[in-house]
Amino acid sequence: MSQQFGNPLMRFLRKVKARFTEREGTRGYQRRLERETRRVERTFAGELQPVLIHTYGKVGSTAIQTSINKLSGFGSFQTHFISEAGVTEARAVHQDHDRDPIHLKVGEALRRGMVEHPDKVVRVITLVRDPVARAVSNLFENPVLLLGENGGDLRKMPVEQVVEIAAEQIRSSLDYTERWFDRELSGLFGFDFFAGPFDREAGFQIREEGRLKLLSGKLELLSNNGGPFLGRFLGLAQSLEIPRRRAREATGEASLYEQVRKSLKLPAAFLDEVYQSRVCRHFYTPAEIDGFRKIWQA
């Protein structure tokens, strides 16, 4: 009797919960969207200094924003797409139940803010990372986005299959990374990002282009050199303390992630393509690239 009673009851409760959750989700989305777009407007119209942690993703930007959010006088935003072309392309990929992801709406609001307040100084922080390590991390953080709703559960796949998927993601990310710098830095702010030199030994560099103050750096040296550069970039009297990045163990996928990292071995010719890219040659020393190759080469 309890089974006959329980199944319909549980189905009914699940439907009620689904309807309630959907309404809450919609209201929560609208509240968060309004809060973030108002924050953009207040930052550009007021006394706060806008700081855009503007990256192509999975390069440690969350840790930097966490630190900046503890400071007064700044309005910080973690962004991936601000340019019109970038937002349009991302919108076609980031589908969220017929709603725009909030970070794309924020990107559009930031672009409007920069147009409406042309004299406002804008600070931009961007980071890079070993492209192979980044692609593997991105796969584990965004499997549905990369593989689709029916792409399968990475945790239930053989390690060999996940390794194959990771290799394919590396290939697809190369062009994305190059286009991102052209669109989201050079195109958006009106200068050739790669025309100026980069201090590859220090791993970070500050430059100014008109209203833009830009700090670019390497994730691999963030814990060593990032704090002093960020402090100087923000006009602080001391280094900016950066929290440790989240350990992979906290995600519940540590074992598979480490197995994939250890099992992923790529042909030398393919690594030539990866590490001879414009982005890698701009940011990394030959010794650093050799170190990456030793990790990943078959």
What are these regions (language model features)?
Residues 2-298:
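Membrane-interface amphipathic segments in extracytoplasmic regions
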